[in-house]
């Protein structure tokens, strides 16, 4: 199991909230998050309640202040929810599709891909089926830009999920010992 502690001030000061599972509304415990300590496991933190908005991946470590987190690539300054990423040690496998509802060109993916356009000759893809493992998708090649967490399941339409103007350009397996 994982454990993440949110503090309302920088440098682990002020009130705190200990979390060992998913939390859809951190603001019911703290009015703001100034620093974070991940004692064990891996977590996705979200800009809005109910796991919505921009996301950022956190592994075990200390995050002293939001300014430092923003310099690491986090593009938002509020954290309202978090999701624990369960430990996983199996194989990784997913299928990506050119169109909604698993239509069009399909590719099976089992490892990291730093540039989907170059490797698969796909400028865009609109649905996927994650069969095994936990993955991070990025909006730019080489694991840059905004990121999204995908766990096993069927994702029939990125547009219906609120990603209508989003193009995923790289993907990485979450292989950390979470």
Curated annotation (Swiss-Prot):
<dbReference type="GO" id="GO:0002088">
    <property type="term" value="P:lens development in camera-type eye"/>
</dbReference>
<dbReference type="GO" id="GO:0007601">
    <property type="term" value="P:visual perception"/>
</dbReference>
<feature type="domain" description="Beta/gamma crystallin 'Greek key' 4">
    <location>
        <begin position="133"/>
        <end position="175"/>
    </location>
</feature>
<comment type="function">
    <text>Crystallins are the dominant structural components of the vertebrate eye lens.</text>
</comment>
<feature type="domain" description="Beta/gamma crystallin 'Greek key' 2">
    <location>
        <begin position="41"/>
        <end position="86"/>
    </location>
</feature>
<dbReference type="GO" id="GO:0005212">
    <property type="term" value="F:structural constituent of eye lens"/>
</dbReference>
<comment type="subunit">
    <text>Monomer.</text>
</comment>
<feature type="domain" description="Beta/gamma crystallin 'Greek key' 3">
    <location>
        <begin position="92"/>
        <end position="132"/>
    </location>
</feature>
<dbReference type="InterPro" id="IPR001064">
    <property type="entry name" value="Beta/gamma_crystallin"/>
</dbReference>
<keyword id="KW-0273">Eye lens protein</keyword>
<protein>
    <recommendedName>
        <fullName>Gamma-crystallin M1</fullName>
    </recommendedName>
</protein>
<comment type="similarity">
    <text>Belongs to the beta/gamma-crystallin family.</text>
</comment>
<keyword id="KW-0677">Repeat</keyword>
<feature type="region of interest" description="Connecting peptide">
    <location>
        <begin position="87"/>
        <end position="91"/>
    </location>
</feature>
<dbReference type="InterPro" id="IPR050252">
    <property type="entry name" value="Beta/Gamma-Crystallin"/>
</dbReference>
<dbReference type="Pfam" id="PF00030">
    <property type="entry name" value="Crystall"/>
</dbReference>
<feature type="domain" description="Beta/gamma crystallin 'Greek key' 1">
    <location>
        <begin position="2"/>
        <end position="40"/>
    </location>
</feature>
<dbReference type="InterPro" id="IPR011024">
    <property type="entry name" value="G_crystallin-like"/>
</dbReference>
């Amino acid at each position: 199991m994982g454990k993440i502690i949110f503090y309302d001030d920088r440098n682990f000061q002020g009130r705190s909230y200990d979390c060992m599972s998913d939390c859809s509304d951190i603001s019911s415990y703290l009015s703001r998050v100034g620093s974070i300590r991940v004692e064990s496991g891996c977590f996705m933190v979200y800009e809005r309640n109910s796991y919505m908005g921009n996301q950022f991946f956190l592994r075990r470590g200390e995050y002293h202040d939001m300014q430092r987190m923003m310099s690491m690539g986090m593009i938002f300054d509020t954290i309202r929810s978090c999701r624990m990423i369960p430990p996983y040690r199996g194989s990784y496998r997913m299928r990506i599709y050119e169109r909604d509802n698993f239509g069009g060109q399909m590719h099976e993916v089992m490892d990291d891909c730093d540039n989907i356009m170059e490797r698969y000759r796909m400028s865009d893809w609109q649905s996927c089926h994650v069969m095994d493992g936990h993955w991070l998708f990025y909006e730019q090649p080489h694991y840059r830009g905004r990121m999204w967490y995908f766990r096993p399941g069927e994702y029939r339409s990125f547009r219906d999920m609120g990603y209508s103007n989003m193009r995923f350009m790289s993907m990485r397996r979450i292989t950390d010992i979470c």
